[in-house]
Amino acid sequence: MKRIGVLTSGGDSPGMNAAVRAVVRKAIYHDVEVYGIYNGYSGLISGKIEKLEIGSVGDIIHRGGTKLYTARCPEFKTVEGREKGIANLKKYGIEGLVVIGGDGSYMGAKKLTEHGFPCVGVPGTIDNDIPGTDLTIGFDTALNTVIDAIDKIRDTATSHERTYVIEVMGRHAGDIALWSGLAGGAESILIPEADYDMEEIIARLKRGHERGKKHSIIIVAEGVGSGVEFGKRIEEATNLETRVSVLGHIQRGGSPTAADRVLASRLGAFAVELLLEGKGGRCVGIQNNQLVHHDIIEILEQKHTIDQSMYRLSQELSI
């Protein structure tokens, strides 16, 4: 294999640039040319493709977002769209592709694999919801962004003796809510993977108030429901002054943490190794700090699960 491509797709995550950098430099180290595909699968269809050199990925390892830009592309879900993409890959002589993104991006890589085109998926999403890997690129940075916000909100919550509901990202996965809630000392954590008892949450807040607690923090993953609505229900039921903070897209931005930069570098380079070994249709990950790879079709058939022991711990510590 003498020429590969790389693209970022779906929602951006801090560390994607570090992964792109690793792909480019690892490939060039092995005398393999690399072509960057801009705007994800949309750029693959439209032909927004250019050759990348070592200098093309200089000064990006510390930057959030993605140099290659990203987009969602419904057209790639059609046979016609994929045929256009494959035609462009052939036009540029690209023999293998590294796809950096979440499960939607993996689905595109799966479709290309079924067309006989070698692809390797690299998990890039703040949601940490890709099976087959302990961590995804961007999760640690997003987690630290949320914890920083929790700490600052707790300061003002204490000053005004208020309850705060903080809504974080996670439509289908509660990892950001669970990890940040545990690290931030939240009184309650609501995630999509677990049922919640509103009466118990209210009772817990009342018990805390009765023993002199001056403030409370509740973390709600967006997939559970509106943080604003939870705030209204809590204030009505407890008569405690309650405020809501929806963190939103700030969770996707920012300079990646050292952990994300290292993870992205390892996974990006490993993806290139697999392509050069002729192993397409795979996706990479890290488990117990060891690099691993799996069949991408099998991973897409699996469902992300929450760490139940961590969830139990969060409940035990929030009494």
UniProtKB/Swiss-Prot annotation:
Major localization class: cytoplasm
Database matches in Pfam families: PFK
First and last residue of the signal peptide: none
Entry keywords, A to Z: Allosteric enzyme, ATP-binding, Cytoplasm, Glycolysis, Kinase, Magnesium, Metal-binding, Nucleotide-binding, Transferase
GO BP term, pick one: canonical glycolysis
Residues given in the record as Mg(2+) binding sites: D103
Binding residues annotated for ATP, in chain numbering: G11, R72, C73, G102, D103, G104, S105
Coiled-coil residue windows: none
Residue positions binding ADP: R21, A22, V23, V24, R25, R154, G185, A186, E187, R211, K213, K214, H215
CDD domains assigned to the protein according to its UniProt record, in alphabetical order: Bacterial_PFK
EC number of the protein: 2.7.1.11
PANTHER family according to UniProt: ATP-DEPENDENT 6-PHOSPHOFRUCTOKINASE, PHOSPHOFRUCTOKINASE
Protein name: ATP-dependent 6-phosphofructokinase
Organism for this UniProt entry: Bacillus licheniformis (strain ATCC 14580 / DSM 13 / JCM 2505 / CCUG 7422 / NBRC 12200 / NCIMB 9375 / NCTC 10341 / NRRL NRS-1264 / Gibson 46)
UniProt gene name: pfkA
